[in-house]
């Protein structure tokens, strides 16, 4: 029930709560009632205070304030047009166009894959249909439910993958997979779904001090520990920067009571220096295998002989701005997935690869715009999490394409071949669309009313 204000106008004819009740009856979206109630009541009380300052009595001040608000039925009808779920048709259409472009890209790439080109192309279309459908389903879900039960969802998420990794342990060529029904799915990209969950967990710790820092670090460390078992260093590094970026945003926005500059300086100082120092010590003490040392040398020394790195660098340096390269035959495995940008550069020119990257950057920009415009801090943080996943994934893919980091598992959102990566991409987009859908409905007032700010 809404709080009741017993102050009345002359003669006790009209009460403030009656005005608000009548107004709210015109608004069909029940989830918007709490935020609208507090917003309108705040306006009325501010106007009452101003009227009293002008030597009005309390009753006259309230009567004048309610008169200024206008007829509650008319005002409620007008607010009903604003405070309702928004249909993001333009964004959905834009995503649909981008999906069609990704299908075109896969057609242009898979036509050069011998024997199985038709299979890969048909499978990509099937994945696109399934993924787009998943996006629409998530879009229709109220994202605040994810925020409300974020810790439970994260716990189930981590336990499920721990079971898959340590109990089931289905490995193919050293990489962990899992089976759902008759499908064998790669596990790595699914961990990126944890990022918006982590943003929702941070939301629940707002207003706390140093005592929640160990809890936050545990929620960060658990998925990172699991990714080390995949094994996939690229996923671990990417996931760390995604989670660390969200934590940095939350701290910088003053969500916690501890000193933000001191915390961030210590956090990033340790995060950067500790891995470097650890690798240096392991190399000096001979704890690393020869192939691991060779990979580290290849990463920082372009003259070191490494077939994969040399191939990627050769493709980039020999690609034409428009048209095919004489090095296009070098790249075979992963040409339509991990190394999609290298393939586009080799077969069609750097311009086509740049267009693909530009489209993704425009999408990322839109995601951050939607997130930063949210009045609801939960929606803002979960939206940032989705945007960060896209940015880090695309950035890492570009680094691999340019031969600047050692080739490891990577994908370019939308364009890389793979059912799991595509579903993950569209689920994250569904969360962003849900945030947009409820932008004028949910507020932090609603969250506080539901007692979500728990330890």
Predicted regions and their residues:
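Loop-to-helix entry and N-terminal half of a specific, functionally important transmembrane alpha helix
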Residues: 370-409, 415
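Hydrophobic alpha-helical segments of polytopic membrane proteins
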Residues: 217-222, 234-282
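Cytosolic juxtamembrane regions of integral membrane proteins
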Residues: 58-115
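Hydrophobic, glycine- and aromatic-enriched re-entrant/interface helices and adjoining loop segments
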Residues: 260-355
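Alpha-helical transmembrane segments of multi-pass inner-membrane proteins
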Residues: 162, 186-250, 431
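Short, small-residue-biased leader/transition segments that mark boundaries at the very start
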Residues: 1-2
């Amino acid at each position: 029930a809404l709080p009741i204000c017993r102050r009345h106008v002359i003669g006790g004819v009209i009460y403030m709560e009656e005005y608000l009740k009548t107004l709210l009856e015109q608004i069909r979206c029940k989830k918007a009632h709490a935020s609208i109630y507090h917003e309108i009541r705040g306006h009325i009380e501010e106007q009452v205070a101003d009227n009293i300052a002008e030597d009005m009595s309390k009753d006259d001040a309230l009567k004048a304030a309610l008169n200024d608000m206008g007829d509650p039925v008319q005002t409620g009808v007008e607010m009903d047009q604003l405070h309702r779920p928004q249909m993001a048709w333009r964004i959905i259409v834009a995503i649909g166009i981008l999906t069609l472009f990704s299908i075109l890209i896969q057609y242009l790439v898979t036509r050069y894959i011998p024997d199985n080109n038709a299979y890969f192309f048909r499978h990509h279309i099937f994945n696109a249909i399934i993924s787009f459908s998943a996006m629409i389903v998530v879009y229709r879900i109220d994202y605040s439910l994810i925020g409300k039960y974020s810790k439970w969802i994260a716990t189930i998420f981590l336990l499920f993958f721990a079971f898959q990794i340590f109990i089931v342990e289905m490995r193919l060529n050293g990489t962990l997979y899992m089976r759902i029904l008759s499908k064998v799915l790669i596990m790595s990209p699914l961990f990126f779904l944890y990022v918006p969950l982590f943003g929702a967990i941070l939301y629940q710790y707002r207003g706390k001090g140093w005592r929640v820092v160990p809890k936050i670090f545990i929620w960060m460390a658990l998925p990172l520990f699991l990714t080390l078992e995949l094994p996939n260093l690229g996923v671990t590094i990417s996931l760390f920067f995604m989670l660390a970026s969200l934590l940095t945003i939350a701290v910088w926005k003053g969500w916690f009571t501890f000193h933000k500059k001191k915390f961030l300086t210590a956090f990033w100082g340790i995060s950067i220096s500790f891995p470097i120092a650890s690798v240096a010590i392991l190399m000096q003490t001979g704890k690393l295998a020869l192939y691991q040392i060779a990979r580290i040398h290849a990463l920082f020394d372009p003259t070191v002989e490494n077939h994969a790195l040399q191939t990627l660098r050769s493709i980039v340096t020999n690609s034409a701005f428009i048209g095919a390269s004489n090095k296009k035959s070098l790249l075979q495995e992963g040409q339509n997935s991990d190394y999609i940008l290298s393939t586009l550069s080799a077969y069609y020119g750097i311009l086509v690869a740049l267009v693909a990257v530009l489209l993704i950057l425009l999408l990322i920009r839109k995601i951050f715009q939607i997130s930063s415009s949210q009045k609801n801090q939960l929606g803002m943080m979960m939206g940032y999490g989705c945007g960060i996943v896209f940015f880090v994934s695309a950035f890492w893919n570009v680094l691999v394409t340019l031969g600047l980091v050692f080739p490891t598992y990577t994908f370019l959102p939308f364009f890389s071949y793979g059912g799991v990566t595509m579903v993950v991409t569209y689920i994250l987009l569904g969360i962003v669309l849900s945030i947009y859908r409820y932008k004028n409905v949910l507020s932090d007032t609603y969250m506080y009313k539901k007692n979500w700010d728990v330890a």
